[in-house]
Amino acid sequence: MLSADDKKIIAQLWEKVAGHQDEFGNEALQRMFVTYPQTKTYFPHFDVHPGSEQVRSHGKKVAAALGNAVKSLDNISQALSELSNLHAYNLRVDPANFKLLSQCFQVVLAVHLGKDYTPEMHAAFDKFLSAVAAVLAEKYR
């Protein structure tokens, strides 16, 4: 559960991300494919090489979904309901992969924001990404 302080910090962090979210989404996916190569199995039709337009496009979608969740911090489940259905029923992605991508997104934020990515931001955004992963996995039950 996100506290009022967490929500405030997450909103402030996303303001810092604004204008870079597509780049960050792309980089997070690239990091995931390199660090966890088994995740490539869910993208058999993608060219997963660095600079791939398909990965760049999907990174934009990831960032847009996170942005949508940030705008709906009081009801992330409703904001991501369609995405949850897609991943559970159509794509059948192992929900463990959501946590892997979350870790990679955290690394991207730390690399790009440096000292501006405070421990408080890290903790709040980690809770947020955990909530997003839980919502995306809730239809699997």
Swiss-Prot record:
* GO terms for MF: haptoglobin binding; heme binding; iron ion binding; organic acid binding; oxygen binding; oxygen carrier activity; peroxidase activity
What does the record say about tissue specificity? Red blood cells.
Q: Name one GO cellular component term.
A: hemoglobin complex
Highest taxon of source: Eukaryota
List cystine links: none
Could you say which residues bind heme b here? Answer: H58, H87
Keywords from the UniProt entry: Heme, Iron, Metal-binding, Oxygen transport, Transport
Single Gene Ontology BP annotation: hydrogen peroxide catabolic process
Cite the Globin domain residue spans from the record.
Answer: 1-141
What does the UniProt function comment say about this protein? Answer: Involved in oxygen transport from the lung to the various peripheral tissues.
Q: Which family does it belong to?
A: Belongs to the globin family.
Tell me the subunit arrangement: Heterotetramer of two alpha-D chains and two beta chains.
In its UniProt entry, what is this protein called?
A: Hemoglobin subunit alpha-D
Identify the species of origin: Anser indicus
